[in-house]
Amino acid sequence: MGFFSSLSSLFGLGKKDVNIVVVGLDNSGKTTILNQLKTPETRSQQIVPTVGHVVTNFSTQNLSFHAFDMAGQMKYRSTWESYFHSSQGVIFVLDSSDRLRMELLKDELMMVMEHKDVVSRGIPIVILANKMDIPGAMTASDITVALGLNLYRSGTWSIHSTCALTGDGLDKAMQQLSAEITKYMESRRT
Amino acid sequence: MKTNKKDEETGGNVYAHLDKTSVLQEARAFNETPINARKCCFILSKLIYIIQQGESIGRTEATEAFFGVTKLWQSKDVSLRRMVYLAVKELAEVSDDVIIVTSSLTKDMTGREDLYRAAAIRALCKITDTGMLQTIERYMKQAIVDRNSAISSSAIVSSIHLMRKSSEVVRRWANEVQEAVSSDNHMVQYHALALLYQIRANDRLAVNKLVQKFSKNALRSPYAVCYLIRIATRCLVDDDQPDSSVFTFIESCLRHKSEMVVYEAARAIVSLPQTTPSEIQPAITALQMCCTSPKAAVRFAAVRTLNKVAMAHPNAVMSCNVDLEKFITDPNRSIATLAITTLLKTGAESSVERLMQQIAGFVNEISDEFKIVVVDAIRSLCSRYPRKHTVMMPFLAKMLRSDGSYDYKKAIVETIIAIIEENPDAKVAGLAHLCEFIEDCEHDNLSTRVLHLLGREAPKTPNPSSYIRFIYNRVILESTKVRAAAVTALAKFGAQCVDLRPSIQVLLKRCLLDSDDEVRDRATFYLKMLTEAAEGLIHNFILDGLQVSPSGLERSILDYLRSGSYSSPFDLRVVPVTQQALSQPEKRVPQLVEEEEKPKAPKVEPYAAQLAAIPQFAALGPVFKSSTRIALTESIAEYTVHMIKHTFANAMVLQFECKNTMNDQLLLDVSVELEDPDGEWETGNTVQIDKLPYGEVHSAFSLLEFPDSGAISGSLGAILKFKVMDVDPTSGEPDSDDTYEQTYVLEEVDVNVSDSVQGVAKSSFGSAWEALGDDATREETFQLSTVENIPDAVKKISEILGLVPCERSDRVPEGKTQHTVFLSGVFRGGYDVLSKATVAVDPNDNSIAMNIIIKSNEPLVADLVISAVV
């Protein structure tokens, strides 16, 4: 690794380190998604509710991610905003079968999307409509309407249906995120 | 040379001149991507350094820094991660939301990287609270029995810390801890044993079992054995009927192969309160062996222990004298000092001079701490061989002249004062040395103490006028505090020596021109008193001082000012009195003499504040006196009750401190019912305890009015009444809402005369006795059958009456067949009570007779008090 990786990073070809924040209501599947993104041998068998946050590292083809997996419970939501400032992307995970909390979800999502550290820096947001495998789950387009996202033009956001247990839809979402982040970082450089 | 070295040191410390703001500013680097591990490590060290130096960091700043630190988890650098753990531990106290790193730490603690695991456990336990602890409980249990000793140890030590805030949860880990005790690793075994003991500490039976069990199957770790010895010693001291096998275990440890264990066992045996010479002997022999060790630390420990027990077991220690003699010239001065002071305690009177000469040779080389040890040894020596004061006094004076810290000088001055008080022969020489000392003393506190002593003692010497020069010099030369004390001392001369009074008045007149208010005020007051007041007033106000408790005085004056009715003058008699005059310093017990364990008389103040908070008792006025805590139950009873009697001007409040030791019961509506078989006493208001959960101590109160018949003593039956609700022992949640009534008979409550009397010493008893007149004098003579000698009789009578002896009249010279003790005190309501009790032994049949005269300024009071003795 050593020599070649340093050589390739010299030419700007190596994997870049990026920080992302993973947020969302409790029990939406944040930790499970990140677990799914790790290489099979490093995955943990058991997922317990996160307290505070955990840093998870994984990589895609061209980026090496440090993901801050934030706790979703009410009392920890205030800690999310401390991490937007130092990150280059946000993943917002939601439970698409949870129709009851749609209004709360909308509030929390708006809080994230309109946070000054997000808006002013224009960092990309990827919304993952998780648990699509559950019967009766809302589709991505339904959720877009329910959350009023179609009225939301400013900022760079995209929505994807996923299933954290099987990994369906995750690859596509991560490709999108990588592309957005690369674009974002290039725009910052210039 | 020395300064050079110092310069290098300060130059070498990069952290020396850190500024809090700039460090916190630098801490922003934590937010950068990618993380520069080396730089962050350095910043973290700075951050931890300033916290360790005691710099206070505000909550917002700390929280900001903390969130920065949490971002460092993305780095995989091992040393940085370990610094992060340290920082988290330091910031845990000052920052908000530390709980958010719980999951990160849990991940590290269960991860594969052993380097992280131990440190993560320590940090995790520091930030967690009782609620959170349950979620990590599973991991903790695993960590305690982990194969890696560092991890196991850190989990156990963290659990010991957790015991303080969430003992209930830690108790559930007992099985794992037990397993860890059988670990092969010395440290793990030691820590596990400590935790196991703490888990069971409240249950004496379980502790006993623990000692029994582990004393049989030998522990590998010497640390653990030492700890077990300490637990065993505690068992022996606490138990009324100690198990002989426990002692056998400690004794067997004397033959352990580890030096540490041998020393610990020996120390434990010699420190036990009741041991026979044959039991002590092996331990002393073991210490003697330690004395010959090549290791200085072991020798030091052995000599120090011998020194400590020298007073308790002089004969046993004497057998080591030969070894101790060798140490006199030991190059380690600390060992030499301890050896000499031990010899001073055990040695014969004849060897004292030789030893003093030895010690004088190097006294300047040892540290102040050990000089204090020497001084204390001299003090106990002087009380043993009073005639030796001629050797000791010049020695002490020489030490007093040399340089030394405040504590050291204080110890010397206290020793000289003690010698003067105990030995009248040494008085003149001692006072002369002290006078010389205050001529050149830089410690105001000591000067004022010496001046106070001079004012009290010097007028009684054959030539009082010679001291006045020293005192007046203080008025001219010293700081305000000392000047004021000197003025008071002068006034005391004037009050006691009538022939010196005119010259004192002249000196006091000069003091009127002093630059400070306090000094002028005192001078004016004393001058007025000395020129115009009667002899009795002079005695009361110059010699006796104000004997009230400062906080009581403050409260009474505040009440008076609040009441707003200034038609009646403020009555000083309602102020609670204390035994010690305002100006009297507390006596320090010399450290090397065996300390006596005596039940401490509670201070009035904490209780007074408690009582004042209860509206039912607010009208009673200030507390006159609070008794000691009296147990009304056996200490191992299901419910323990301690009683404290608070006396007010016209009533008594009994405070019952109840403790519930049943973990499956919740007590409701707890109260104590009192019943007087004679029907004289009646209970007034009571305050009950609404809820008394397991393990907590709460107080119930009952008001007793003093009966109209004038009785001030009696005994009342007491019954604890309460409702029981069964609860689940582990959670404390009630099983059901059902309750049932229950009663529990307590021991009888005795009310005595001494509850109504507060002992207050008069500094000149004779004049106070004269001043009271003969209107209310009662006399009584009777035989004492329960006591066998005069000192016991004197002690008993002062206990019964609640009066305190004056003018050291409680000290009975040996071999006398007759002795008179002067007692004085204040009856509730502020009436003076004085008493002269003459005790005599009948030489024929050794029976003891006592004649007691009681005087008061109120005849009724004299009647009441005399009734207590009859």
UniProtKB/Swiss-Prot annotation, chain A:
> Which keywords belong to this entry?
Cytoplasm, GTP-binding, Lipoprotein, Myristate, Nucleotide-binding
GO molecular function annotations of the record: GTP binding; GTPase activity
Keyword Lipoprotein carried by entry = yes
Lipidation feature positions (N-myristoyl glycine) = 2
Q: Which Pfam families match?
A: Arf
Q: One GO cellular component from the entry? A: dendrite
Q: Name one GO biological process term.
A: vesicle-mediated transport
Cross-referenced SMART domains: ARF, RAB, SAR
Lipoprotein in keyword set: yes
Compartments, as annotated in UniProt: Cytoplasm
Tissue expression from the record = Specifically expressed in ciliated cells.
So where does GTP get bound? 24-31, 69-73, 130-133
Say which domain of life the source belongs to.
Eukaryota
- Family the entry assigns: Belongs to the small GTPase superfamily. Arf family.
- The identity of this protein, by name, is ADP-ribosylation factor-like protein 6
Q: Which organism is it from?
A: Caenorhabditis elegans
UniProtKB/Swiss-Prot annotation, chain B:
The cellular location(s) given in this protein's UniProt record come to: Cytoplasm; Golgi apparatus membrane; Cytoplasmic vesicle, COPI-coated vesicle membrane
A GO CC annotation recorded here is: endoplasmic reticulum
- What does the UniProt record say this protein does? The coatomer is a cytosolic protein complex that binds to dilysine motifs and reversibly associates with Golgi non-clathrin-coated vesicles, which further mediate biosynthetic protein transport from the ER, via the Golgi up to the trans Golgi network. Coatomer complex is required for budding from Golgi membranes, and is essential for the retrograde Golgi-to-ER transport of dilysine-tagged proteins.
Lineage start: Eukaryota, Metazoa, Ecdysozoa, Nematoda, Chromadorea
Q: Which organism is it from?
A: Caenorhabditis elegans
**GO BP:** endoplasmic reticulum to Golgi vesicle-mediated transport; intra-Golgi vesicle-mediated transport; intracellular protein transport; organelle transport along microtubule; protein secretion
- Report the SUPFAM superfamilies cross-referenced here: ARM repeat, Clathrin adaptor appendage domain, Subdomain of clathrin and coatomer appendage domain
Q: How does it assemble?
A: Oligomeric complex that consists of at least the alpha, beta, beta', gamma, delta, epsilon and zeta subunits.
Database matches in Gene3D superfamilies: Coatomer, gamma subunit, appendage domain, Leucine-rich Repeat Variant, TATA-Binding Protein
For this UniProt entry, the molecular function terms from Gene Ontology, in alphabetical order, are:
structural molecule activity
- Membrane topology field: Peripheral membrane protein
Keywords assigned: Cytoplasm, Cytoplasmic vesicle, ER-Golgi transport, Golgi apparatus, Membrane, Protein transport, Repeat, Transport
Domain of life of the source? Eukaryota
Q: Does the keyword Repressor apply?
A: no
Name of the protein this chain belongs to: Probable coatomer subunit gamma
